[in-house]
């Protein structure tokens, strides 16, 4: 993955011009739910992954209502870009205001087929970026920030080695692992088991 994304990065950086800096918050944790929740749901996702989009469309709302909004669990979103467009989309989302991040990625998932298959994906992503509060100047600054690109790529490689993550979406919940498209019942069983292990059932 490193070589492929690195070659793409060089081409894309040349396209957006001289290097500038992304906002300092671009690499901070992105999470939903209370910081002190007893259970952490780690989601590893690629923004061009159709099964990831299905999770956000069909299942996340149920998890949010049952566990995140009740302070029983916290969902931490980890970028795991599987292709060049997913990497660019991840950078774009992280450069927006942190409080709008999950709204931003929900739009990216809902409109995934449109922007990922567009003849000009940069223009398609820029349109979404502007809806999320980014200027074109900030959009270009983020895409030309080699440090941000390297950091996202390195994080994905690190978790791939540490947790043997090879596909998306992958979820780690306590000692349980969920891969691919799964129904809410499967997440409920894993979260309830983790709550029981934490003495919070």
Task: List each model region and its residues.
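Generic signal for short, ordered secondary-structure residues
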Residues: 27-28, 42, 71, 83, ...
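Extracytoplasmic thiol/disulfide redox context detector
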Residues: 2-82, 153-162, 193-201
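Structural alpha/beta surface segment adjacent to cysteine/selenocysteine redox centers
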Residues: 45-47, 53-130
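C-terminal cap of thioredoxin/glutaredoxin-like
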Residues: 3-5, 22, 46, 60, ...
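Conserved short-loop catalytic and cofactor-binding motifs
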Residues: 29, 77-80, 113, 140, ...
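Short N-terminal micro-motifs specific to bacterial/archaeal maturation
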Residues: 32-35, 43, 95, 116, ...
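Structural motif
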Residues: 38-39, 99, 166
């Amino acid at each position: 993955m490193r070589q492929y994304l690195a070659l793409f990065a060089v081409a894309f950086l040349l396209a957006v011009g001289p290097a500038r800096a992304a906002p300092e918050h671009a690499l901070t944790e992105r999470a939903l739910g209370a910081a002190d929740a007893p259970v952490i749901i780690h989601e590893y996702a690629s923004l061009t992954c159709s099964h990831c989009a299905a999770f956000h469309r069909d299942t996340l709302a149920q998890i949010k209502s049952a566990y995140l909004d009740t302070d029983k669990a916290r969902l931490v979103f980890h970028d795991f870009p599987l292709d060049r467009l997913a990497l660019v989309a991840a950078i774009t989302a992280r450069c927006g205001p942190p409080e709008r991040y999950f709204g931003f990625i929900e739009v990216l998932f809902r409109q995934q087929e449109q922007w990922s298959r567009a003849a000009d994906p940069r223009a398609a992503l820029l349109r979404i970026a502007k809806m999320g509060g980014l200027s074109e100047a900030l959009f270009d600054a983020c895409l030309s920030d080699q440090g941000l690109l390297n950091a996202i790529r390195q994080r994905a490689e690190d978790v791939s080695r540490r947790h043997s993550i090879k596909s998306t979406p992958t979820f780690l919940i306590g000692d349980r692992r969920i891969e691919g498209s799964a129904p809410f019942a499967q997440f409920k069983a894993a979260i309830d088991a983790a709550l029981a292990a934490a003495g919070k059932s």
